[in-house]
Every structure is written in C-alpha cells, then in structure tokens.
Amino acid sequence: MLPISYTNLNSSRITRDGTASSASRYRRLIPEYFRRIFHYPQMDIEYTFWIMFYLCFNPSRVYRVTSWHKQTKNQWARDDPAFAVILVFFMAIASMSYAITFHFLSFLNVIKVMFWAVFVDFITVGLLIATIGWWVTNKFLRVSVHNHSVDQSVEWLYAFDIHCNSFFPLFIILYVVQFFLLPILLSNSLFAAILSNTLYIIGFSYYYYVTFLGYNALPFLQHTVVFLYPIGILFALYIVSVVMGKNLTVSIINFYFGFQL
C-alpha cells in the first residue's frame, strides 16, 4: 500500500475548495449578464435580430414576449447581453462612417467620435436614464400591495433593457436614415430644416413610446402613461425650431466635429 501524505491531501483539498469558493465569489460579484459579454457562443444572435426587427415595426410584440420570459426565467430583464453588444457594434460602425464623411480621418479623431457616440450617448446617458426610470417606477408607480400579495419591483437591468430597446429605433432614424439624407439635410433651406427636425422628433418620440411600452408591460405598475408626456414637450420644441429655421442636423454635426457648416 502506497503511503499517503495527509499534508498534500489537505492542501489539495484546500486548493480545490479555494478555487471553488473563488469561482462562486466571482459569480456573485459579476452577474451572468456581464459574464456572457465575453462568451459569444452563449449569445442568441438570431433572437436579438428578431427583437430589433420588431422594435422598428411592432414594438408591442417584443414586450408580449417579456411576460413569457418572466414565467420561464423568473425575471423581467434579459440575461443575454447580445442586444447591447450588437447595438454598440452598430454604433461604432455608424460613428466611424460619420467621421470619415466629415474628414475626421486621424486615428484619434475617429476614436473620439466612436467613444462619444458609444460611451456617452448610449451607455452613460442610458445608465442615467435607466437609473431614473428604475427609481421613479419603484418609488411612485408601483401598485399598492395587499397583505397576501407578493411585493414586486422593477429590476434595474430591466430598466436598462428598456433603454436599449428604445434606443435602437432612434439609432436607425438618427444615425442610419439621417446619414443617407445628409446631402439634403445639410442644404441651407427651410425644407432641409423641416425634414431634419421631423427626423429628430420622430426618433425621440419613438424612444419615449417604446419606453412607455416597456414599463406598461409590468402588471404591478400604474400610471405609466407619464412616460409619454415628454412627447408633448418635444412637439412644442419642434414647432419652435421650425419657426426659427433651426436645422438640428447642422447643429449636431457642428457639435460633434467642432466646425461650422
């Protein structure tokens, strides 16, 4: 019989236990959503493109699927980061296209435009909007809970999902459609100003509409119509901008690229 070293056995057990405990701590500290960002095979790309398609043409259908997700995964939020990852990729390509179009050709300038579009416009603003939506809904819009009812609340990640869903149609309108209409939108005419401002009011109104649908899909929230109120403000600003002859496309391009068109 071979001699057994209990010291080695114990150290081996400690190593295995330590590795297991480290892995469990890692899983607790980093949610599955963020871990899967680095595991492309775990992302459901086909389902993500299905969501993107219907967000543009029938967004209410997307949120009907949300209730099924709650029943199967016991959470409202997506556990798959594919949507955010693909949207970031699309935004990087679009912002790089704008940089090339306006002769922002140096490497640092291209990175600057991509960084601003992805990490400021989409991620930073999105984190802020999601946090505000999460706080407002949980603080003011939840239905009163009865004694024997389960207390439910809006998940922060679901609020961020809503932002991602709402941002995609806005991206299509204000990044993609606007890009192909630039020869018209940048002309010095009243028609160009009206067309440009119409694109912006459609894009942002659609953003708030999809946001409303997202929160309205939660059965424990009430008065979610408040998420449609900003559309009225947008319409008033639209009228003012048209009367003043303000072209929002020109203003945005001047802001991003630092020159006067």
UniProtKB/Swiss-Prot annotation:
Localization annotation: Membrane
Record has Membrane as a keyword: yes
Membrane-traversing stretches: 37-57, 82-102, 113-133, 166-186, 190-210, 225-245
Membrane topology: Multi-pass membrane protein
Family per similarity comment: Belongs to the unc-50 family.
Pfam families: UNC-50 (PF05216)
Species whose genome carries this gene: Dictyostelium discoideum
Keywords: Membrane, Transmembrane, Transmembrane helix
GO terms for cellular component: Golgi membrane
UniProt keyword Electron transport present: no
Protein name per the record: Protein unc-50 homolog
